Amino acid sequence: MIFKIPDLLTPEELAQITDQLALSEFIDGKLTAGWHAKLVKNNQQLSRQDSTYDALKGLLQKALERNPLFQVAARPKIVHSVLFSRYTDGMAYGRHTDNALMGGSSFLRSDLSFTVFLNPPGAYEGGDLVIESADSETAYKLEAGTAIIYPSTTLHRVDPVTSGERLVAVGWVQSLVRDASQRELLFDLETVRRSLFAQGGKTDEFDLLSKSVANLLRQWVE
């Protein structure tokens, strides 16, 4: 399941992030890539040793924590390995899949990947995020403050930036529910449950559906 979150970040949060990134130290993105991804990764990233990194990462994580769509659809156990990336003229990230395990010896699983767009699409040419499916591919170039969340199992790429500057935050989620089809089923049931409550309050049908959602969580949560 791929889903977008418009306005994940407020205008004030966006301004805070972009203002600080403009003054921060960026390093070669290959330093955080797997051995095969290094061959196709050409971007820059905010150094994790930079004095602003922890604050910006915390701001982004809080935005995800407060967002109900992200919480219900992703069922996050932990959001990890956050990176702030910059692409300028000629930079790209070729076709790749994300590492299954991240965080060094912590062995954090990547179930879901996310990209948060930090500047408007008019600020750069090219630079689309392209996600492949079995028989097609879809390009995304979204408004500043918007997030897209997609399975880490996919092949995807960032097309070359031909002018301007592309700023994004990327990260990964280890979900409480490992199986993608189970997460989607829980999301659909939760959507129906909330719709029933909005229409009729705490009815017998709402209670029965709530029981089923809770019992599925008991079976599937790790």
Describe the function of each predicted region:
Residues 1-76, 81-83, 185-222:
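Non-heme Fe(II)/2-oxoglutarate
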Residues 68-181, 186-187:
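Catalytic core of non-heme Fe(II) oxygenases with the double-stranded beta-helix
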